[in-house]
Amino acid sequence: MKHLLTAADLSREDATAILDNADRFREALVGREVKKLPTLRGRTIITMFYENSTRTRVSFEVAGKWMSADVINVSSSGSSVAKGESLRDTALTLRAAGADALIIRHPASGAAQQLAAWTLDEHGGPSIINAGDGTHEHPTQALLDALTIRQRLGSVEGKRVVIVGDVLHSRVARSNVALLHTLGAEVVLVAPPTLLPVGVADWPVTVSQDIDAELPLADAVLMLRVQAERMNGGFFPSSREYSVRYGLSEKRQSRLAEHAVVLHPGPMLRGMEIAYSVADSSQSAVLQQVSNGVHVRMAVLFHLLVGSEQEAISA
């Protein structure tokens, strides 16, 4: 496997190998005073973030550094992009500089695929990892969500995962639908009709507008942020109305099964799509997701740069 561009790129075997290795990396680092493994020593990883990010950017940087790779950050404000350089020319420059992997977040859907095409050469070019492209995909987020579900519930297969909120603008939702389906979960989307994408009827999901009917049946609930920055019209009457209809309040949380887990990709709009008390409750796995993000991204880098057949952990 050369690139990770979409969650659909992952076979069940690939996804399971990445999740298993993420757990191995987590276990290998427990108790280490210096969190360093030699796995990617001598490799160069470059992050290219053209959109704001905290969790994804930091976790990729930490993942690379914990594996002893050289991690270099390129941003639009601090590079020749600010002078008008195209994404293609930037990518070719970084390939020529000897990057082993390019990790890109970009506002344009399809940017990661373009990067893979532009950087292909007779040696194969660097591995490309999609860290979020527009409203299209965010495959490593789906992997860390799946890992969190597996850790909390024992497995992903056969579990009912309810995804609530702004599905229309959510790359997280698209990647989760694809990966959860691959891993054998049942996926339910709960959203107002205005926040569902065209063609959702062809997705391997059940669609509902009734959050109260779905919560008691859920093994996991993934709450999505309303992405106001991607909206240029009225998708719902008001923030208050949205919260009343689709927010995960403390009262709604009481309808969840005792074993059910609450997920959120962040950043959270507390008080809108999720109540303060719910976000901080024992059923919430939000901080576990962040921790898993580092280990999953370590496993993805290992999978692409070393190979799934190699030993993931060495002292």
UniProtKB/Swiss-Prot annotation:
L-aspartate binds at K83, R171, R225. InterPro entries: Asp/Orn_carbamoyltranf_P-bd (IPR006132), Asp/Orn_carbamoylTrfase (IPR006130), Asp/Orn_carbamoylTrfase_sf (IPR036901), Asp_carbamoyltransf (IPR002082), Asp_carbamoyltransf_Asp/Orn-bd (IPR006131). Belongs to the aspartate/ornithine carbamoyltransferase superfamily. ATCase family. It catalyses: carbamoyl phosphate + L-aspartate = N-carbamoyl-L-aspartate + phosphate + H(+). NCBIfam families: asp_carb_tr (TIGR00670), PRK00856.1 (NF002032). This is Aspartate carbamoyltransferase catalytic subunit. Catalyzes the condensation of carbamoyl phosphate and aspartate to form carbamoyl aspartate and inorganic phosphate, the committed step in the de novo pyrimidine nucleotide biosynthesis pathway. One of its GO terms (cellular component) is cytosol. Gene3D superfamilies: Aspartate/ornithine carbamoyltransferase. HAMAP family: Asp_carb_tr. GO terms for biological process: 'de novo' pyrimidine nucleobase biosynthetic process; 'de novo' UMP biosynthetic process; amino acid metabolic process. The keyword S-adenosyl-L-methionine does not apply. Keywords: Pyrimidine biosynthesis, Transferase. It is an enzyme of class 2 (transferase). Carbamoyl phosphate binds at R55, T56, R105, H138, Q141, G266, P267. Its EC number is 2.1.3.2. Pfam families: OTCace, OTCace_N. SUPFAM superfamilies: Aspartate/ornithine carbamoyltransferase (SSF53671). GO terms for molecular function: amino acid binding; aspartate carbamoyltransferase activity. Heterododecamer (2C3:3R2) of six catalytic PyrB chains organized as two trimers (C3), and six regulatory PyrI chains organized as three dimers (R2). It comes from Mycolicibacterium vanbaalenii (strain DSM 7251 / JCM 13017 / BCRC 16820 / KCTC 9966 / NRRL B-24157 / PYR-1). Pathway: Pyrimidine metabolism; UMP biosynthesis via de novo pathway; (S)-dihydroorotate from bicarbonate: step 2/3. The keyword Nucleotide-binding does not apply.
